[in-house]
Protein backbone atom coordinates (compact mmCIF):
# COMPACT_ATOMS: atom_id res chain seq x y z
CA UNK A 1 0.00 0.00 0.00
CA UNK A 2 2.86 2.38 0.76
CA UNK A 3 4.03 2.02 -2.83
CA UNK A 4 0.70 3.26 -4.23
CA UNK A 5 -0.67 5.92 -1.89
CA UNK A 6 0.64 9.50 -1.76
CA UNK A 7 3.38 9.58 0.96
CA UNK A 8 2.18 12.95 2.27
CA UNK A 9 -1.50 12.08 2.77
CA UNK A 10 -0.54 8.78 4.42
CA UNK A 11 1.48 10.64 7.09
CA UNK A 12 -0.75 13.67 7.79
CA UNK A 13 -0.88 14.30 11.58
CA UNK A 14 1.88 11.70 12.10
CA UNK A 15 4.86 13.74 10.91
CA UNK A 16 3.20 15.97 8.27
CA UNK A 17 0.83 18.92 8.61
CA UNK A 18 -2.10 20.01 6.45
CA UNK A 19 -1.33 22.27 3.47
CA UNK A 20 -4.72 23.98 3.76
CA UNK A 21 -5.57 24.96 7.34
CA UNK A 22 -9.18 25.95 7.97
CA UNK A 23 -12.40 24.63 9.46
CA UNK A 24 -15.89 25.73 8.41
CA UNK A 25 -19.42 24.45 8.25
CA UNK A 26 -19.86 21.47 5.92
CA UNK A 27 -22.20 23.51 3.71
CA UNK A 28 -19.27 25.79 2.81
CA UNK A 29 -16.73 23.00 2.42
CA UNK A 30 -17.01 22.55 -1.37
CA UNK A 31 -16.93 26.33 -1.96
CA UNK A 32 -13.82 26.86 0.19
CA UNK A 33 -12.09 23.84 -1.36
CA UNK A 34 -12.73 25.19 -4.86
CA UNK A 35 -11.34 28.58 -3.81
CA UNK A 36 -8.15 26.89 -2.59
CA UNK A 37 -7.83 25.17 -5.96
CA UNK A 38 -8.29 28.48 -7.82
CA UNK A 39 -5.74 30.25 -5.61
CA UNK A 40 -3.03 27.67 -6.34
CA UNK A 41 -3.90 27.58 -10.05
CA UNK A 42 -3.81 31.37 -10.50
CA UNK A 43 -0.52 31.75 -8.62
CA UNK A 44 1.16 29.09 -10.76
CA UNK A 45 -0.23 30.74 -13.93
CA UNK A 46 1.07 34.16 -12.90
CA UNK A 47 4.49 32.80 -11.91
CA UNK A 48 4.76 30.40 -14.87
CA UNK A 49 8.13 31.92 -15.81
CA UNK A 50 9.56 30.77 -12.48
CA UNK A 51 7.18 27.88 -11.80
CA UNK A 52 10.13 25.54 -11.19
CA UNK A 53 11.16 27.68 -8.20
CA UNK A 54 7.90 27.10 -6.30
CA UNK A 55 8.09 24.33 -3.70
CA UNK A 56 4.63 24.62 -2.14
CA UNK A 57 1.64 26.91 -1.57
CA UNK A 58 0.04 26.84 1.88
CA UNK A 59 -3.36 28.38 2.62
CA UNK A 60 -4.52 29.48 6.09
CA UNK A 61 -8.02 30.78 6.93
CA UNK A 62 -8.78 32.04 10.44
CA UNK A 63 -11.59 34.25 9.16
CA UNK A 64 -14.16 33.47 6.42
CA UNK A 65 -13.38 36.80 4.69
CA UNK A 66 -9.57 36.71 5.00
CA UNK A 67 -7.13 34.31 3.33
CA UNK A 68 -3.42 34.02 4.12
CA UNK A 69 -1.33 32.49 1.33
CA UNK A 70 2.22 31.29 2.06
CA UNK A 71 4.44 30.71 -0.99
CA UNK A 72 7.37 28.40 -0.23
CA UNK A 73 10.38 28.97 -2.50
CA UNK A 74 14.20 28.80 -2.44
CA UNK A 75 14.37 32.13 -4.34
CA UNK A 76 12.16 34.69 -2.54
CA UNK A 77 13.48 37.62 -4.59
CA UNK A 78 12.20 36.24 -7.90
CA UNK A 79 8.72 35.68 -6.42
CA UNK A 80 8.48 39.07 -4.67
CA UNK A 81 9.61 41.01 -7.75
CA UNK A 82 10.92 44.56 -7.97
CA UNK A 83 9.80 46.42 -4.82
CA UNK A 84 7.11 43.78 -4.20
CA UNK A 85 5.40 44.28 -7.56
CA UNK A 86 4.65 40.58 -8.08
CA UNK A 87 3.03 40.17 -4.66
CA UNK A 88 0.84 43.22 -5.24
CA UNK A 89 -0.33 41.93 -8.64
CA UNK A 90 -1.01 38.44 -7.26
CA UNK A 91 -3.04 39.93 -4.40
CA UNK A 92 -5.18 41.99 -6.80
CA UNK A 93 -5.70 39.00 -9.10
CA UNK A 94 -6.82 36.69 -6.28
CA UNK A 95 -9.10 39.35 -4.77
CA UNK A 96 -10.97 39.59 -8.10
CA UNK A 97 -11.26 35.80 -8.34
CA UNK A 98 -12.61 35.00 -4.87
CA UNK A 99 -13.74 38.47 -3.60
CA UNK A 100 -11.93 38.16 -0.27
CA UNK A 101 -9.07 39.94 1.46
CA UNK A 102 -5.75 38.30 0.52
CA UNK A 103 -2.54 38.36 2.55
CA UNK A 104 0.56 36.89 0.86
CA UNK A 105 3.68 35.75 2.71
CA UNK A 106 6.94 34.26 1.47
CA UNK A 107 8.71 31.35 3.17
CA UNK A 108 12.27 30.58 2.10
CA UNK A 109 13.59 27.03 1.61
CA UNK A 110 16.98 27.04 3.30
CA UNK A 111 18.20 23.72 1.83
CA UNK A 112 16.67 23.18 -1.64
CA UNK A 113 18.79 20.03 -2.15
CA UNK A 114 16.63 18.35 0.53
CA UNK A 115 13.26 19.47 -0.86
CA UNK A 116 11.63 16.78 -3.03
CA UNK A 117 9.48 19.23 -5.01
CA UNK A 118 12.44 21.47 -5.84
CA UNK A 119 14.45 18.41 -6.94
CA UNK A 120 11.58 17.24 -9.19
CA UNK A 121 11.20 20.76 -10.65
CA UNK A 122 14.93 20.98 -11.37
CA UNK A 123 14.93 17.64 -13.18
CA UNK A 124 11.87 18.60 -15.26
CA UNK A 125 13.45 21.93 -16.21
CA UNK A 126 16.66 20.27 -17.41
CA UNK A 127 14.74 17.61 -19.35
CA UNK A 128 12.83 20.41 -21.12
CA UNK A 129 16.22 21.92 -22.03
CA UNK A 130 17.17 18.60 -23.71
CA UNK A 131 19.77 17.54 -21.14
CA UNK A 132 20.33 13.76 -20.93
CA UNK A 133 17.86 12.40 -18.37
CA UNK A 134 20.33 9.77 -17.12
CA UNK A 135 22.92 12.44 -16.40
CA UNK A 136 20.33 14.65 -14.67
CA UNK A 137 19.04 11.87 -12.41
CA UNK A 138 22.49 10.73 -11.31
CA UNK A 139 23.59 14.31 -10.65
CA UNK A 140 20.49 15.08 -8.54
CA UNK A 141 20.91 11.80 -6.65
CA UNK A 142 24.54 12.42 -5.70
CA UNK A 143 23.92 16.08 -4.74
CA UNK A 144 21.07 15.28 -2.34
CA UNK A 145 22.89 12.36 -0.71
CA UNK A 146 25.97 14.53 -0.13
CA UNK A 147 23.79 17.21 1.52
CA UNK A 148 22.48 14.77 4.14
CA UNK A 149 19.57 12.79 2.68
CA UNK A 150 19.29 9.26 4.10
CA UNK A 151 17.66 7.92 0.96
CA UNK A 152 16.38 9.10 -2.42
CA UNK A 153 14.34 7.52 -5.19
CA UNK A 154 13.67 9.26 -8.52
CA UNK A 155 11.37 7.92 -11.24
CA UNK A 156 10.91 9.47 -14.68
CA UNK A 157 8.37 8.24 -17.24
CA UNK A 158 7.32 9.13 -20.78
CA UNK A 159 8.87 9.12 -24.25
CA UNK A 160 12.40 9.25 -22.92
CA UNK A 161 14.95 10.35 -25.50
CA UNK A 162 12.19 10.64 -28.12
CA UNK A 163 11.44 6.90 -28.10
CA UNK A 164 8.27 5.82 -29.89
CA UNK A 165 7.12 3.70 -26.94
CA UNK A 166 6.85 5.35 -23.54
CA UNK A 167 8.79 3.76 -20.70
CA UNK A 168 10.02 4.57 -17.21
CA UNK A 169 13.50 4.87 -15.70
CA UNK A 170 14.29 4.78 -11.99
CA UNK A 171 17.34 5.41 -9.80
CA UNK A 172 17.63 4.86 -6.06
CA UNK A 173 20.22 5.26 -3.32
CA UNK A 174 19.94 4.66 0.42
CA UNK A 175 16.76 3.69 2.30
CA UNK A 176 13.28 4.85 1.24
CA UNK A 177 10.84 2.99 3.58
CA UNK A 178 7.45 3.93 2.12
CA UNK A 179 5.55 1.47 4.36
CA UNK A 180 7.02 2.92 7.59
CA UNK A 181 4.63 5.59 8.87
CA UNK A 182 7.19 7.13 11.23
CA UNK A 183 9.55 7.70 8.28
CA UNK A 184 9.78 11.38 7.32
CA UNK A 185 9.41 11.10 3.54
CA UNK A 186 9.14 14.17 1.34
CA UNK A 187 7.43 13.70 -2.04
CA UNK A 188 7.55 15.82 -5.17
CA UNK A 189 6.01 15.59 -8.63
CA UNK A 190 6.63 17.69 -11.74
CA UNK A 191 6.04 17.55 -15.49
CA UNK A 192 8.35 18.43 -18.36
CA UNK A 193 6.70 19.72 -21.56
CA UNK A 194 8.77 18.35 -24.48
CA UNK A 195 8.22 18.13 -28.24
CA UNK A 196 7.55 14.40 -27.79
CA UNK A 197 4.92 14.93 -25.10
CA UNK A 198 4.76 15.21 -21.32
CA UNK A 199 7.42 13.50 -19.19
CA UNK A 200 6.53 12.96 -15.53
CA UNK A 201 9.06 13.15 -12.69
CA UNK A 202 8.47 11.70 -9.21
CA UNK A 203 10.84 12.09 -6.25
CA UNK A 204 10.77 10.36 -2.85
CA UNK A 205 13.22 11.80 -0.29
CA UNK A 206 13.85 10.05 3.05
CA UNK A 207 15.02 12.45 5.78
CA UNK A 208 15.02 10.11 8.79
CA UNK A 209 12.55 8.58 11.24
CA UNK A 210 10.34 10.46 13.70
CA UNK A 211 10.11 8.60 17.02
CA UNK A 212 7.88 9.16 20.03
CA UNK A 213 4.79 11.34 20.42
CA UNK A 214 4.99 14.58 18.46
CA UNK A 215 3.66 17.95 19.60
CA UNK A 216 2.81 21.05 17.57
CA UNK A 217 6.14 22.62 18.52
CA UNK A 218 8.33 19.77 17.25
CA UNK A 219 6.20 18.33 14.44
CA UNK A 220 8.41 16.88 11.72
CA UNK A 221 11.55 16.90 13.91
CA UNK A 222 13.81 13.93 13.23
CA UNK A 223 15.01 12.07 16.34
CA UNK A 224 17.88 9.62 15.97
CA UNK A 225 18.96 9.00 19.58
CA UNK A 226 18.52 5.21 19.53
CA UNK A 227 19.23 2.63 16.83
CA UNK A 228 16.05 1.46 15.15
CA UNK A 229 14.42 -1.91 15.78
CA UNK A 230 15.31 -4.38 13.07
CA UNK A 231 12.92 -6.79 11.40
CA UNK A 232 12.33 -9.88 13.55
CA UNK A 233 13.10 -8.13 16.86
CA UNK A 234 10.11 -7.82 19.20
CA UNK A 235 9.42 -4.52 20.92
CA UNK A 236 9.34 -6.26 24.32
CA UNK A 237 12.92 -7.50 24.05
CA UNK A 238 14.29 -4.47 22.21
CA UNK A 239 15.94 -2.84 25.27
CA UNK A 240 17.49 -6.16 26.25
CA UNK A 241 18.87 -6.59 22.73
CA UNK A 242 20.34 -3.08 22.84
CA UNK A 243 22.13 -3.83 26.13
CA UNK A 244 23.51 -7.07 24.71
CA UNK A 245 24.78 -5.22 21.65
CA UNK A 246 26.54 -2.63 23.81
CA UNK A 247 28.20 -5.35 25.89
CA UNK A 248 29.29 -7.21 22.75
CA UNK A 249 30.78 -4.03 21.28
CA UNK A 250 32.63 -3.39 24.55
CA UNK A 251 34.07 -6.92 24.54
CA UNK A 252 35.18 -6.58 20.92
CA UNK A 253 36.92 -3.26 21.55
CA UNK A 254 38.66 -4.66 24.65
CA UNK A 255 39.80 -7.73 22.72
CA UNK A 256 41.19 -5.50 19.97
CA UNK A 257 43.17 -3.47 22.54
CA UNK A 258 44.55 -6.62 24.15
CA UNK A 259 45.57 -8.02 20.78
CA UNK A 260 47.33 -4.76 19.95
CA UNK A 261 49.27 -4.90 23.25
CA UNK A 262 50.24 -8.55 22.56
CA UNK A 263 48.76 -10.05 25.73
CA UNK A 264 48.46 -13.82 26.21
CA UNK A 265 45.12 -15.60 26.72
CA UNK A 266 45.68 -15.93 30.50
CA UNK A 267 46.55 -12.26 30.82
CA UNK A 268 43.56 -11.30 28.69
CA UNK A 269 41.24 -13.39 30.87
CA UNK A 270 42.62 -11.78 34.02
CA UNK A 271 42.15 -8.29 32.58
CA UNK A 272 38.59 -9.07 31.53
CA UNK A 273 37.76 -10.25 35.07
CA UNK A 274 39.27 -7.15 36.64
CA UNK A 275 37.70 -4.90 34.01
CA UNK A 276 41.07 -3.21 33.57
CA UNK A 277 43.04 -2.07 30.54
CA UNK A 278 46.60 -2.49 31.79
CA UNK A 279 49.24 -3.01 29.15
CA UNK A 280 51.65 -5.97 29.07
CA UNK A 281 54.57 -3.77 30.13
CA UNK A 282 52.75 -2.72 33.30
CA UNK A 283 52.06 -6.36 34.25
CA UNK A 284 55.73 -7.27 33.68
CA UNK A 285 56.88 -4.38 35.87
CA UNK A 286 54.54 -5.49 38.68
CA UNK A 287 55.92 -9.05 38.51
CA UNK A 288 59.50 -7.72 38.77
CA UNK A 289 58.60 -5.65 41.83
CA UNK A 290 57.03 -8.68 43.53
CA UNK A 291 60.06 -10.86 42.69
CA UNK A 292 62.52 -8.24 44.00
Curated annotation (Swiss-Prot):
Biological processes annotated in GO: translation
Annotated ranges, domain KH type-2: 39-110
Keyword flag Ribonucleoprotein: yes
Keywords tagged on the record: Ribonucleoprotein, Ribosomal protein, RNA-binding, rRNA-binding
InterPro entries hit by this protein: KH_dom, KH_dom-like_a/b, KH_dom_type_2, KH_sf_prok-type, Ribosomal_S3_C_sf, Ribosomal_uS3_bac-typ, Ribosomal_uS3_C, Ribosomal_uS3_CS
Family statement drawn from the similarity comment of this UniProt entry: Belongs to the universal ribosomal protein uS3 family.
Function summary: Binds the lower part of the 30S subunit head. Binds mRNA in the 70S ribosome, positioning it for translation.
Quaternary structure, from the entry: Part of the 30S ribosomal subunit. Forms a tight complex with proteins S10 and S14.
UniProt protein name: Small ribosomal subunit protein uS3
Organism of derivation: Borrelia garinii subsp. bavariensis (strain ATCC BAA-2496 / DSM 23469 / PBi) (Borreliella bavariensis)
High-level lineage: Bacteria, Pseudomonadati, Spirochaetota, Spirochaetia, Spirochaetales
Annotated gene: rpsC
Amino acid sequence: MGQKVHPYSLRVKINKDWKSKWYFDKKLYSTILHEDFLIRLEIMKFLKGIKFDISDIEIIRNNPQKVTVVIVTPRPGSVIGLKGSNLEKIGQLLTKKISKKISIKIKEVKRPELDAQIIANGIAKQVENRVSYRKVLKSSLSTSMLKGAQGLKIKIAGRLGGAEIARSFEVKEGRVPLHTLRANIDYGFSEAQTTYGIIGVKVWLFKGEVLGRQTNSDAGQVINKKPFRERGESVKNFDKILNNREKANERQSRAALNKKDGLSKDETGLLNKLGSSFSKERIDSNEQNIGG
